[in-house]
Amino acid sequence: MSVVDFYDELAPEFHLIYEDWNIAIDHQGVAIDRLIRSRLPDAQSVLDCSCGIGTQALGLASRGYKVLGTDVSERALDRARLEAIHRGLDIAFMACDLRELETLQGTYDVVISCDNALPHLLTDDDVAQALRAMYSKLLPGGLAVITVRDYDKELVERSVTAAPRVNPGTPRKVVVRLHDWDAPDGPMYTVHFLILTERSTGWSISHHSARYRAIGRDALTAAAAKAGFTNIRWHQAEDIGFYQPAMTALRDGE
């Protein structure tokens, strides 16, 4: 299954990975806003280049940022547009691969890629291309924010599952996530999302999968520096109130 197919299929139910998506939108907006302000206090414009159904874009727009959200999944973008309208938020959304951001017009104070999107890129060249593209969309002195899973920890522990998420509505749904590592010492793995839905006749199951490549902090830091970023910092999840660690980096003023 391609990344596009994965997110197209998950778009109607992607919110189920959160205990309460509306609360997550608010909490993540607060956390990312605080992180941005700690490094770039006067930031106003944000490009969310892997916005999905809009979790961070919605949260930041509600805090006054001018946001453009881009993604490879048209169905996720359709969902994000509807969510923005429902909340009365003025957010532009358009389809764009994060490796091809140079095709977009304009530059921004901040470019973000959250929710472990970058590790969908399975080669060093693809990661380098994406980082260069993010760099190209920043104003001089602008800030990049990237959040990924804690791969320094994951590459040691090799977790194979996350705690099931039970969503008590009607119908009841249970989300199970499995991590299927290709090799005990390699970076490649497949994530399987299993969504169980309670029916009058029993339970139905839908399955969605996507490929990832674990990338540790040192490797991502080196790749960002090679792309031109400076003043690169890592922030622990618990320190910033986010569910993943974050890397921030600056484009030099010119």
What residue ranges belong to the model's regions?
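Conserved class I S-adenosyl-L-methionine
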Residues: 1-52
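Class I SAM-dependent methyltransferase SAM/SAH-binding core
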Residues: 55-100
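A short acidic, Gly/Pro-enriched loop at the edge of an enzyme's catalytic core
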Residues: 102-110
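A short SAM/SAH-binding and catalytic strip from SAM-dependent methyltransferases
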Residues: 109-125
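A short glycine-rich, Lys/Arg-flanked "PGG" loop and its adjoining helix->strand segment in the class I
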Residues: 128-140
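SAM-dependent methyltransferase
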Residues: 145-219
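C-terminal lobe and adjacent flexible extensions of AdoMet/dcAdoMet transferase-like proteins
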Residues: 211-254
